[in-house]
Amino acid sequence: MSADLAQLVTLIAQRARAASLTLATTSTAAKNSALLRLADLIAGSTLPLLNANQLDIAAAKKHGLTQAQIDRLTLTPIRLTQLADSVRHVATLPDPVGEVLEETTRPNGLVLRRVRVPIGVIGIIYEARPNVTIDCAALCLKSGNAAILRGGKESFHTNTALAALIAQALSAAELPADAVQLIPTTERAALTHLLTLDSLVHCIIPRGGESLIRFVAEHSTIPVIKHYKGVCFVYVDREAHLKMAEQIVVNAKTSRPGVCNAAEQLLVHRGVATKFLPAIARALNAAHPVELRCDAESAAILAQENLPHVAASDADFSTEFLDYILAVRVVDSIDTAIATINRDSSNHSDAIVTNDTSAANRFLAGVDSAAVFWNASTRFNDGVEFGLGAEIGISTDRLHARGPMGLRELCSYKWLVSGIGQVRS
């Protein structure tokens, strides 16, 4: 890596640290002013943003990205409107900074308060989705954190255009423009250097594929909160309402197959497999043709009715396809389903469909994932759907946050201790 590149990344981190100290004491009104200005800028910049996005889409097609990957990259007028609305929504959310989490008075008269404070400087490493640029900027700003954004090469032009709007919004609210910065290169060396700046950056959040997250975890000297791949299961129990199960599986698989909370694996109890599997194959085909990768038992059931399928490999049951592909397996019990999910899933989002409350509670307690659903689609594992506002991502870690990371999850805490001259004996 060149000395100039290292110097540039270090300077970005130094400026972010200085900005974070200002943001930590910035009023809610000032932060909301910047957010509302950003929303207006997004809404008023549709044409230049779409033009920048088209440059990225053209490059993606040239380099052979899949349709699902291109969908994640693509902005449309509707998606830009939704993006602006999500920023406005963040402005309406309660400011977590300064919230008193607990207060107590010690026998010696000391008054202790534990209050929420920003983490400080957060580095966010992500790939194709340009909406992450805005979502992360909005959430970091509202929670009083400075953000260093490093997007992927797939969305470089779009991210650059969005970052310019963020800087304008911050300046308009008289906040430091360095509070949100985009690293202006996609060179891997810049990322590697950023990951060593533990005296300036307090947390790294990678969002992307397995190779990116492993690279960040292996090279970072800064604490990492991983937003790992979504290998998400739906289990249809023998006591399931089968029409409900159809609707849930179709939604979980086909509504947006390129996102991390889409279902990738389907487990079906043997007691309902003969009836359910042909029905779900037809329902999926009616919504959008889905390639079913089946174990031997499910393949035999579909073959009896001449329904299309292919043989699954062992790897298919732990793969995030991000496409119209679903791995299908028949299981003999709920215990087998739970064990399979805990072995093969990414601990992200998993669901059971059943009318048996006892079975549901067993599944909810036994599946070790960030979000576990009963009679609902895995697609609901989302910050907006959980009432958190736009999320910074969905953590599959156990520390410091798990599941959708909203404003509160972007805070730490500190102790405020008030006395009247007490000294320790």
Curated annotation (Swiss-Prot):
SUPFAM superfamilies linked to this entry: ALDH-like (SSF53720)
Could you state one GO biological process linked to this protein?
Answer: L-proline biosynthetic process
Kindly give the Pfam families that the UniProt entry links to this protein.
Aldedh
Q: Among its keywords, does the record have Oxidoreductase?
A: yes
- Top-level EC class, please? oxidoreductase
Localization terms from the record? Cytoplasm
EC number(s): the record gives 1.2.1.41
Q: Which reaction does it catalyse?
A: L-glutamate 5-semialdehyde + phosphate + NADP(+) = L-glutamyl 5-phosphate + NADPH + H(+)
Q: What is its main location?
A: cytoplasm
Q: Kindly state which keywords UniProt assigns to this record, in alphabetical order.
A: Amino-acid biosynthesis, Cytoplasm, NADP, Oxidoreductase, Proline biosynthesis
GO terms for cellular component: cytoplasm
Asked whether the UniProt record includes Cytoplasm among its keywords, one would answer yes
MF terms from GO for this chain are: glutamate-5-semialdehyde dehydrogenase activity; NADP binding
Q: In which pathway does it act?
A: Amino-acid biosynthesis; L-proline biosynthesis; L-glutamate 5-semialdehyde from L-glutamate: step 2/2
- HAMAP family, from UniProt? ProA
List the NCBIfam families hit by this protein, alphabetically.
PRK00197.1, proA
Give the family, as the similarity comment puts it.
Belongs to the gamma-glutamyl phosphate reductase family.
Summarizing the function annotation, the protein's role is: Catalyzes the NADPH-dependent reduction of L-glutamate 5-phosphate into L-glutamate 5-semialdehyde and phosphate. The product spontaneously undergoes cyclization to form 1-pyrroline-5-carboxylate.
Record's PANTHER family?
DELTA-1-PYRROLINE-5-CARBOXYLATE SYNTHASE, GLUTAMATE SEMIALDEHYDE DEHYDROGENASE
Q: What is this protein called?
A: Gamma-glutamyl phosphate reductase
Underlying gene:
proA
